[in-house]
């Protein structure tokens, strides 16, 4: 006798911020015996190797933004082509439910599912609902949120909102209970700096200049791990080598970033939803520099969730100067109690079972069809 095993189609834009929580959900669904397929865009090739999907469907996608009318029109045409691809995929896969994690690449498959009367679940990772999710919210059966308070949820959709938290990667969960490192006098001070592909440039410009301004006794204790763009790497390393630091490691990418976070006394980073959720999961204090220029200021809202509970400092990029950063580093490193209190505060915001909560919600929705 053939046993029917339901399939869930997970939709996520091909960047880590969308794909990592989608991947965590996929593992949780598979643990429940639910099959998973992934719909995404062409950018996914470099980071989808570990995604537990029995099939990956690449959908044409574009973002209809910018000032150019021709560019926006071209994006709409591309999205239309993606809708046709998505509709064929949804009919062929016949999913019990479709889950979207935001970004314009999710619009064609989510919209196709809604028009074909397949139940859809949205997951909004940020503290401000993105435009793609806002567009899809009206037709979604359930809207799951990564943060308790989320701005921009359409008024008619608020009754369908459920706070699940942001699904956490297994690599982060594996180090989530690592004790905060000792801050004994004269012990190493471990600083981790990263910013993603769009954020590493400002970190490479500001952080070295700030470290130069630290007292020599702090510099001698400082063990620095920093993400730097390939074009900035040599200059950044050479600059640090002349400062007499206790240790320096710079690289364009760290595969073991969760472990690096767990080893750090302090993190300086952007404030994407995954970063903020992982800082809370591991319990590490941070200086956060939200990515400027976003229309909805989602990273500023994300950073505020930790700043408001004393787990982080949020500094706008316009105020993120060497003098300001140096002053904050001295203040924190010379008052270790502030760091330990911030680390404890961060853990009060964590939801380690967010992937399981979301998987239960998806399974319940799929079973109701």
Swiss-Prot record:
Keywords: Cell cycle, Cell division, Cell inner membrane, Cell membrane, Cell shape, Cell wall biogenesis/degradation, Glycosyltransferase, Membrane, Peptidoglycan synthesis, Transferase. It is a peripheral membrane protein. One of its GO terms (cellular component) is plasma membrane. It is an enzyme of class 2 (transferase). InterPro entries: GlcNAc_MurG (IPR006009), Glyco_trans_28_C (IPR007235), GlycoTrans_28_N (IPR004276). It catalyses: di-trans,octa-cis-undecaprenyl diphospho-N-acetyl-alpha-D-muramoyl-L-alanyl-D-glutamyl-meso-2,6-diaminopimeloyl-D-alanyl-D-alanine + UDP-N-acetyl-alpha-D-glucosamine = di-trans,octa-cis-undecaprenyl diphospho-[N-acetyl-alpha-D-glucosaminyl-(1->4)]-N-acetyl-alpha-D-muramoyl-L-alanyl-D-glutamyl-meso-2,6-diaminopimeloyl-D-alanyl-D-alanine + UDP + H(+). Its main location: membrane. UDP-N-acetyl-alpha-D-glucosamine binds at residues 15-17, 126, 169, 197, 299. One of its GO terms (biological process) is peptidoglycan biosynthetic process. Its EC number is 2.4.1.227. Pathway: Cell wall biogenesis; peptidoglycan biosynthesis. Pfam families: Glyco_tran_28_C (PF04101), Glyco_transf_28 (PF03033). It comes from the Bacteria. It is found in: Cell inner membrane. One of its GO terms (molecular function) is UDP-N-acetyl-D-glucosamine:N-acetylmuramoyl-L-alanyl-D-glutamyl-meso-2,6-diaminopimelyl-D-alanyl-D-alanine-diphosphoundecaprenol 4-beta-N-acetylglucosaminlytransferase activity. Belongs to the glycosyltransferase 28 family. MurG subfamily. Cell wall formation. Catalyzes the transfer of a GlcNAc subunit on undecaprenyl-pyrophosphoryl-MurNAc-pentapeptide (lipid intermediate I) to form undecaprenyl-pyrophosphoryl-MurNAc-(pentapeptide)GlcNAc (lipid intermediate II). This is UDP-N-acetylglucosamine--N-acetylmuramyl-(pentapeptide) pyrophosphoryl-undecaprenol N-acetylglucosamine transferase.
């Amino acid at each position: 006798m053939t046993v029917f095993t339901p399939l869930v189609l997970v939709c996520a834009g091909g960047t880590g911020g969308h794909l990592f929580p989608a991947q965590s959900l996929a593992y949780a669904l598979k643990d429940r015996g639910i099959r998973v397929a992934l719909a995404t865009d062409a950018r996914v090739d470099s980071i989808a190797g570990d995604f537990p999907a029995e099939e990956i469907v690449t959908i044409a996608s574009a973002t209809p933004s910018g000032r150019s009318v021709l560019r926006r029109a071209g994006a709409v045409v591309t999205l239309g082509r993606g809708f046709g691809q998505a509709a064929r995929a949804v009919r062929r896969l016949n999913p019990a439910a479709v889950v979207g994690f935001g970004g314009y690449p999710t619009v064609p498959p989510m919209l196709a599912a809604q028009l074909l009367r397949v139940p859809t679940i949205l997951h909004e990772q940020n503290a401000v609902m993105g435009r793609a999710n806002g567009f899809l919210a009206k037709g979604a059966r359930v809207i799951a949120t990564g943060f308790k308070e989320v701005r921009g949820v359409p008024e008619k959709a608020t009754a369908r909102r459920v706070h699940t938290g942001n699904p956490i990667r297994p690599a982060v969960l594996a180090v989530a209970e690592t004790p905060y490192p000792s801050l004994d006098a004269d012990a190493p001070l471990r600083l981790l700096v990263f910013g993603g592909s769009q954020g590493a440039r400002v970190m490479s410009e500001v952080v070295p200049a700030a470290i130069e301004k630290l007292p020599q006794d702090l510099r001698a204790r400082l063990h620095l791990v920093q993400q730097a763009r390939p074009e900035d790497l040599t200059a950044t390393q050479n600059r640090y080598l002349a400062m007499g630091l206790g240790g320096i490691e710079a690289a364009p990418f760290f595969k073991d970033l969760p472990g690096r976070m767990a080893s750090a006394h302090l993190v300086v980073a952007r404030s994407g939803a995954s970063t903020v959720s992982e800082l809370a999961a591991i319990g590490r204090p941070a200086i956060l520099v939200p990515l400027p220029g976003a229309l909805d200021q989602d990273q500023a809202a994300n950073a505020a969730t930790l700043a408001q509970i004393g787990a982080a400092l949020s500094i706008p990029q316009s105020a993120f100067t060497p003098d300001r950063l140096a002053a904050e580093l001295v203040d924190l490193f010379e008052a270790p109690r502030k760091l330990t209190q911030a680390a404890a505060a961060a853990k009060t915001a964590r939801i380690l079972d967010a992937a399981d909560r979301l998987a239960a919600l998806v399974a319940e929705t799929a079973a109701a069809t």
